[in-house]
Design a protein with these regions (language model features):
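Hydrophobic transmembrane alpha-helices and immediately adjacent juxtamembrane helices
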Residues: 1-120, 124-134, 138-247
């Protein structure tokens, strides 16, 4: 059905990027200059972008369910009005939608991890360099939770399909410039600081550190960033739903 095609597209897109850039461009580039894993070994370009695309896959799975899906239910399906007429509250609605989006992000992360593990086994270049890479799945869940919470909060303020297009307008540059395909050191320092504030950069650095075995204090900072994102997203969402449907 068309629904499954839409669901699959969010997973397939990062896989295509990995094939085109990782295996294609990676064969020309070789190792990434100045980047080593936790054991001090050089990192191939494919191993460099694979965790970034894993984080992106988790984001894609969460963001589309918590934005377009929620937008339709809010403005056309009139689903939330019926739910809130029962004993359920706005927090229940928010957690239900966000949990569903989180599950999709988790499924994308599981599938993409299987893909990069298979590619690493076939090419002889392991894309997960450390046992800590197993925690990348848990990191993907946190990432999906954060983006789903914030995505639903933003969507609750949008009123038209034209306004919804602003979400993609923000996501694409964030995907391209958040250290997905090359280190931030290529940018001026002030640009680097601006990118540090972006949630996808935080997600990519968290997953990349785990897959490369680089465990440091910065990892905790990335985790806290998403905890704040989750709490803030839930707070804004519940307040907005209350003002829309419980006046």
């Amino acid at each position: 059905s068309s629904t499954w095609i839409i669901v699959a597209s969010g997973f397939v897109e990062p896989v295509f990027y990995l094939m085109a850039f990782g295996l294609g461009l990676g064969a020309v580039i070789g190792n990434v200059t100045g980047i080593v894993d936790g054991a001090g070994n050089p990192v191939s370009y494919t191993a460099y972008i694979a965790p970034a695309l894993l984080a992106t896959s988790a984001m894609n799975g969460a963001i589309y369910d918590s934005t377009w899906n929620v937008f339709f239910k809010m403005h056309f399906g009139k689903l939330y009005q019926g739910i809130l007429a029962t004993s359920m509250g706005t927090l229940d609605v928010a957690l239900g939608e966000i949990t569903w989006a989180l599950m999709r992000g988790f499924a994308y992360a599981i599938g993409f991890t299987a893909v990069i593990s298979g590619i690493g086994a076939v090419t002889g270049d392991p894309l997960i360099r450390s046992w800590t890479g197993i925690f990348a799945i848990l990191a993907a869940v946190l990432i999906a939770f954060g983006f789903a919470s914030f995505g639903m909060a933003i969507t609750s303020y949008l009123k038209s399909f034209q306004q919804m297009n602003w979400i993609n307008f923000f996501l694409m540059p964030m995907f391209l410039f958040s250290g997905t395909f090359y280190p931030l050191s290529v940018y001026p320092e002030w640009v680097q600081w601006a990118i540090h504030a972006m949630p996808l950069w935080q997600a990519i650095e968290m997953v990349r550190g785990l897959t490369l075995g680089i465990i440091d204090a910065a990892l905790l900072g990335h985790v806290l960033y998403f905890v704040v994102m989750i709490v803030g997203g839930l707070w804004f969402t519940t307040r907005r739903l209350r003002s829309l449907f419980l006046r």
